[in-house]
């Protein structure tokens, strides 16, 4: 049986918070469907007047769903050896995705880059996963400090 550290609870809470964020974006798409009269299962609007706004709201949610599986994988695995770092990066990703979505919601897709911190956080989370793999394989050892062959310097 594997034993996770008590601090892994932060990772679990971050994962739950990410679901709340994804649900929030989904609710926004549902509201936009009603407002712009886009019925299921149509994914994108062709309405020349309001289609662009609906499509921006839909794309913000869809793009988040596209990166959600890697986010959850990196959070879950990277958090095994680095629960606090992974949780902090996970929160940065969540905030970045909200900034991304609300930038997109303006109707100006270039404003989605306000959420670039989320992409940086995702790459850093990938780093915690790689570091965890190296530690698990015994290629480096956990810990801080110079000369310890750790991920932290």
Swiss-Prot record:
InterPro entries: MAPEG, MAPEG-like_dom_sf, Membr-assoc_MAPEG
Covalently lipidated residues, kind S-palmitoyl cysteine: 151
Native source species: Mus musculus
Stretches assigned to the Mitochondrial intermembrane side: 1-8, 92-119
Protein name: Glutathione S-transferase 3, mitochondrial
Molecular function (Gene Ontology), one example: glutathione transferase activity
Described purpose of this protein according to its UniProt entry: Displays both glutathione S-transferase and glutathione peroxidase activities toward oxyeicosanoids. Catalyzes the Michael addition reaction of reduced glutathione (GSH) to electrophilic eicosanoids to form GSH adducts, as part of detoxification or metabolic shunt processes. Mediates GSH conjugation to leukotriene A4 to form the sulfidopeptide leukotriene C4. Metabolizes cyclopentenone prostanoids, specifically mediates GSH addition at C9 within the cyclopentenone ring of 15-deoxy-Delta12,14-prostaglandin J2 (15dPGJ2) to form 15dPGJ2-glutathione. L-cysteine cannot substitute for GSH.
One GO cellular component term: mitochondrial outer membrane
Signal peptide bounds: none
Entry keywords, A to Z: Lipid metabolism, Lipoprotein, Lyase, Membrane, Mitochondrion, Mitochondrion outer membrane, Oxidoreductase, Palmitate, Transferase, Transmembrane, Transmembrane helix
Catalytic reaction list: leukotriene C4 = leukotriene A4 + glutathione; 15-deoxy-Delta(12,14)-prostaglandin J2 + glutathione = 15-deoxy-Delta(12,14)-prostaglandin J2-S-(R)-glutathione; (5S)-hydroperoxy-(6E,8Z,11Z,14Z)-eicosatetraenoate + 2 glutathione = (5S)-hydroxy-(6E,8Z,11Z,14Z)-eicosatetraenoate + glutathione disulfide + H2O
Principal location class: mitochondrion
Record-listed E.C. numbers: 2.5.1.-, 1.11.1.-, 4.4.1.20
Record's subcellular location: Mitochondrion outer membrane
Family: Belongs to the MAPEG family.
TM regions (residue ranges): 9-29, 71-91, 120-140
Record membrane topology: Multi-pass membrane protein
Pfam families: MAPEG
UniProt topological domain (Cytoplasmic) ranges: 30-70, 141-153
Pathway given in the UniProt record: Lipid metabolism; leukotriene C4 biosynthesis; Lipid metabolism; arachidonate metabolism
GO biological process: one example: arachidonate metabolic process
């Amino acid at each position: 049986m594997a034993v996770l550290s008590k601090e892994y609870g932060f990772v679990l809470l971050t994962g739950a918070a990410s679901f709340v964020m994804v649900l929030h974006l989904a609710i926004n798409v549902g509201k936009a469907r009603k407002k712009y009269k886009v019925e299921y299962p149509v994914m994108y609007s062709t309405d020349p007047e309001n289609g662009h706004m609906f499509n921006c709201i839909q794309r913000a949610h869809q793009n988040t769903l596209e990166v959600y599986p890697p986010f959850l994988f990196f959070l879950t695995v990277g958090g095994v050896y680095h629960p606090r770092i992974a949780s902090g990066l996970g929160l940065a990703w969540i905030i970045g995705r909200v900034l991304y979505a609300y930038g997109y919601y303006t109707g100006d897709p270039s404003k989605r880059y306000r959420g670039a911190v989320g992409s940086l956080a995702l790459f850093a989370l990938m780093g915690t996963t790689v570091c965890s793999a190296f530690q698990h394989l015994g290629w480096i050892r956990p810990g801080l400090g110079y000369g310890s062959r750790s991920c932290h310097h």
